[in-house]
Structure formats: structure tokens, C-alpha cells
Amino acid sequence: MQAALPIRSRLLHALRSFFHERGFVEVETPVRLAAPALELHIDAEPAGDHWLRTSPELHMKRLLAGGLEQIFQLGPCFRRGERGDRHHPEYTMLEWYRARADYTDILADTKALLAYCAQAVLGRTDLVYRGQKIALLPRWERLTVAEAFQQWAGWNPVTQWDAERFDLDLVEKVEPNLPREVPVVLTDYP
């Protein structure tokens, strides 16, 4: 833990620097809410007669609608009952929005952000995750969900939707087969 805290501190500094250098405004939105966001698969944590936020999205979108064109937030979020390799009930979330940006713009932001932070924290633009070296530059693999499922699960969820089968096949058939040496983005979720 002692070794991780200075790295976390450098990462948080790099995240803020990335957005500040690009003209984003850092915002803080409420953590304790009168009512939880209506999320089908996400349970909010109660806090007395209020709820802890699961995401700052709703309040940030109000700021965006109010005229702030580029905003970001780093802060605590809470999700009840989520604990595992990829989930913890309390965590720090980064969320950002740009007026008039589409998902390809946000994907470009993400690519630049990860390379920027890796360089700032590690001194290079590649990293090792679970023993696998991942090059953050120059290219990222990009597949549609339909392409990935057709290739590794043998069906197309865009034309044959089955929510239970989708979740199971994503975890058991698609994710294990995705390339490991570069970041992979699945687009066009049904």
C-alpha cells in the first residue's frame, strides 16, 4: 500500500494536468443525493435518509446543459454489492464531457489520456498488466460488438438479442479472445 500511494498521487496529478492543459474545467458535484439515479443494474448505497452517488453523470450533464463546454471530475463513487477483481463498492471515478463531441472524439480523448498518464507516471507509453505488455501507442484495435461476437461466440447480438446470453458470452467467449498487446475498443453495443 505504501508503494501504491505515491503512484496514485502521480496518476491523479497527471489526470488533472491532462484536462487542464486542454481547457477543461474541473467540477465537483454532490456525493450525497436525495434520491438515487434510476439504474437497472446498479444499486446505490444508502446514507441515512439520502444515497451515495453511483456516478456524477446527471449533475455533470446539468452543468454541460448550463453552458460549461468541457468539464471533468475526479471523485468518489459508491456501488452497493459490487466487489470482485474489477469492482469495489467505493472507488474514484473519472468522468468528463465535451459539448458537441461524439464517441469517436471521446475515444481519441481516452487514447491520448492513457498515453499521457503512462508517460507521466511510468516514463513510457506502454504498461504491463497481469504479465502482458500493452502498447498504448500508436494503434488501438477497434471492433464492433457484432464483429467480436460473430468471430468468437458464433452469433450476432445486434440481430438476435438475448441479454443473458450476451453477458455470459461477453465474459466467457469474447473478452478472453481479445488481443492483449494493444488496447481494444468494442463499439456499437446493441
Placement of each model-derived feature along the sequence:
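Class II aminoacyl-tRNA synthetase-like tRNA-binding/catalytic domains
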Residues: 1-105, 115, 165, 190
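Short, contiguous, pocket-lining structural segments
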Residues: 7, 102-109, 137-144
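Short amphipathic alpha-helices in soluble, non-transmembrane regions
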Residues: 111-113
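Metal-assisted phosphate- and nucleotidyl-transfer catalytic regions
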Residues: 116-190
